[in-house]
């Protein structure tokens, strides 16, 4: 799938009456009845992610179906439109999920995404408790590559956590869920929205101070710590206590790790964002840290490195790496129906102008 040519500026969202308009776009031919919706493979605040098979060619996709009513009720349409905008910019990076196309009905929004069935990093961590350093290094390197690419587009990710890191059928990382991304953040710029997931919030976010790209490198440190030790670095079941720990408790690294790993964790999880690794030269500082010295970054980017773990999926219908809580849920028949257009208010339609997107072409994944 191709988006707009490299170097072509994307249209800037315009706002009126709280609605978000990404500019002219349309996908009039796409509709829910194009797919057989087979299984629920994920759930979120506003809808579900389903394994879907396109009737025309038998291709498998992950289709994220969101309820407009729920989004509008919480006034979150800007996050949904930001996710759509960011997804269009990410299609050329090997470790970011690709948007094939998007469309809408009067009641729902549909993201048609790459189908990735190697499981969430969270799923594998829950099962294995922790990873050895070589495996953690491989995943951290691929995630850092993806974050560095987003930063090169002036995008802060802001929600890095194991649940948003998928593995593909070969075991490579795929970063997903761009709803909290902030676009248009230049290297010297800051932003101040309080958002993220409690276990991975950086101190500057908790202090409600202006923050910059270094917030993502804190999150990388938190995820790496969790991969190596089984829990986030300042974890407590009491969220208030966890926030206190993030703000004031010195980082405690259990024994058994290399000096390089300990130094990287200390550098990424520095409470002063100005002193944090990545705060000056961004991704270049991460790449050059001694912990990543075994990594050939060019080979990594081109997927010439063999992943340390193979999910061993037998094909698209192999759902063993998805939570049975999702896959055993019945698929609502309404998801695959094209409803009567008269049934929806014009307000819901105007709130998502520019959401629909049709690609110039449509490639099929290798697995």
UniProtKB/Swiss-Prot annotation:
The protein's GO terms of the molecular function aspect are: ATP binding; potassium channel regulator activity; protein serine kinase activity; protein serine/threonine kinase activity; sodium channel regulator activity
Q: What class of enzyme is it?
A: transferase
This chain's protein is named Serine/threonine-protein kinase Sgk2
Family, per entry:
Belongs to the protein kinase superfamily. AGC Ser/Thr protein kinase family.
Give the Enzyme Commission number: 2.7.11.1
Q: Where is this region: Disordered?
A: 1-26
* One GO BP annotation of this record: protein phosphorylation
Protein location: Cytoplasm; Nucleus
Q: Which organism is it from?
A: Homo sapiens
Modification after translation, per record: Activated by phosphorylation on Ser-356 by an unknown kinase (may be mTORC2 but not confirmed), transforming it into a substrate for PDPK1 which then phosphorylates it on Thr-193.
GO CC annotation, single = cytosol
Among Pfam families, the record links this protein to: Pkinase (PF00069), Pkinase_C (PF00433)
Residues modified to Phosphothreonine:
193
Q: Where is the active site?
A: 159
Keyword Nucleotide-binding listed? The answer is: yes
């Amino acid at each position: 799938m191709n988006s707009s040519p490299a170097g072509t500026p994307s249209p800037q969202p315009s706002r009126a009456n709280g609605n978000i308009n990404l500019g002219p776009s349309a996908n009039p031919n796409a509709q829910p009845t194009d797919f057989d919706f087979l299984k629920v493979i994920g759930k979120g605040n506003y809808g579900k992610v389903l394994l879907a098979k396109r009737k025309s060619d038998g291709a498998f996709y992950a289709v994220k179906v969101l309820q407009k009513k729920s989004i509008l009720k919480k006034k979150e349409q800007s996050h949904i439109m930001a996710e759509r905008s960011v997804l269009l910019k990410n299609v050329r990076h090997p470790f970011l999920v690709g948007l094939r196309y998007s469309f809408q009905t009067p009641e729902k929004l549909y993201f048609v995404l790459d189908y990735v069935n190697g499981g969430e990093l969270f799923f594998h961590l829950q099962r294995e408790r922790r990873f050895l350093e070589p495996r953690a290094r491989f995943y951290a390197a691929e995630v850092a590559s993806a974050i560095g690419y987003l930063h090169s587009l002036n995008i802060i990710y802001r929600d890095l956590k194991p649940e948003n890191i998928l593995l593909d059928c070969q075991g490579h990382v795929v970063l997903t869920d761009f709803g909290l991304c902030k676009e248009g953040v230049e290297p010297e710029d800051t932003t101040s929205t309080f958002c993220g997931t409690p276990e991975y919030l950086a101190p500057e976010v908790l202090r409600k101070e202006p923050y910059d790209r270094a917030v993502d490198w804190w999150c990388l440190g938190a995820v790496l710590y969790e991969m190596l030790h089984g829990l986030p670095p300042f974890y407590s079941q009491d969220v208030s206590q966890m926030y206190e720990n993030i703000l004031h408790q010195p980082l405690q690294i259990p024994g058994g790790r290399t000096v390089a790993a300990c130094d990287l964790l200390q550098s990424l999880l520095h409470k002063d964002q100005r002193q944090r690794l990545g705060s000056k030269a961004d991704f270049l500082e991460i790449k050059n840290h001694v912990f990543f010295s075994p990594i050939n970054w060019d080979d990594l980017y081109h997927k010439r490195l063999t992943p340390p773990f193979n999910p061993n999926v037998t094909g698209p219908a192999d759902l063993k790496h998805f939570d049975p809580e999702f896959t055993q849920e019945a698929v609502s028949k309404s998801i695959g129906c094209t409803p009567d257009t008269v049934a929806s208010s014009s307000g819901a339609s105007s709130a998502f102008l520019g959401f629909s997107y049709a690609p110039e072409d449509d490639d099929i994944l290798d697995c």
